[in-house]
C-alpha cells in the first residue's frame, strides 16, 4: 500500500517540471535595447503550422512544427525599424542555443520581399509542447543542421 502512494506522490511532485513554462528568448543588437521574448508575447503573434521534412542519417524524417515566424517576431518588436529594406539586407543575425550552438542567417533570407524563408520559432512538435525551450527550424533546408534547439538568443548584427 505504501509503494503505490509513494509513486503517486513522486509523479505529483514532478508534474510542475513536466509542464514548466518555456524560457524567454533575448533579442539583441542593431541599436535596440535587449528584448526578452516571453511565451505570452509570442502567443500574441500569428501562429504558423507546417510539415517539414529533413534528411537524417536514417533517411527522411517529417515532423509537424507549430510556432511563430521569426520575421513576425522581429517586426512586432520593431527590431529593424529605421532601416530601409536595402539597409536591412546588409544585416545578419546569430541564433544561439543554450548549449552554445550557433547558426547565422541573413535578414535577406527571411525578408518577405526577398528570400522569404519561413524561419519558425517552434513551441510544439507533432502536437506536443517542447521540453527545454524554443526551437528554430528552417523549412526548405534539405538537412536540419540549421535547426537550433533550446534557443536563448537572437543577436542582430
Task: List each language-model region with its residue ranges.
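Positively charged n-region of N-terminal signal peptides that target proteins for export
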Residues: 1-4
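Bacterial N-terminal signal peptides
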Residues: 6-15
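N-terminal intrinsically disordered, low-complexity segments enriched in P/E/S/T
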Residues: 19-157
Amino acid at each position: 500500500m505504501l509503494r503505490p502512494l509513494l509513486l503517486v506522490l513522486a509523479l505529483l511532485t514532478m508534474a510542475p517540471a513536466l509542464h514548466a513554462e518555456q524560457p524567454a528568448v533575448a533579442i539583441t543588437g542593431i541599436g535596440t535595447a535587449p528584448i526578452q521574448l516571453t511565451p505570452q508575447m509570442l502567443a500574441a503573434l500569428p501562429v504558423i503550422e507546417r510539415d517539414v521534412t529533413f534528411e537524417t542519417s536514417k533517411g527522411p524524417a517529417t515532423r509537424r512544427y507549430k510556432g511563430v515566424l521569426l520575421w513576425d517576431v522581429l517586426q512586432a518588436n520593431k527590431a529593424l525599424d529605421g532601416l530601409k529594406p536595402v539597409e536591412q539586407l546588409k544585416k545578419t543575425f546569430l541564433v544561439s542555443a543554450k548549449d552554445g550552438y550557433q547558426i547565422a542567417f541573413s535578414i535577406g533570407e527571411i525578408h518577405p520581399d526577398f528570400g522569404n524563408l519561413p524561419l519558425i520559432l517552434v513551441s510544439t512538435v507533432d502536437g506536443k509542447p517542447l521540453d527545454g525551450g524554443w526551437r528554430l527550424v528552417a523549412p526548405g533546408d534539405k538537412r536540419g543542421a540549421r535547426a537550433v534547439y533550446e534557443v536563448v538568443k537572437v543577436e542582430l548584427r
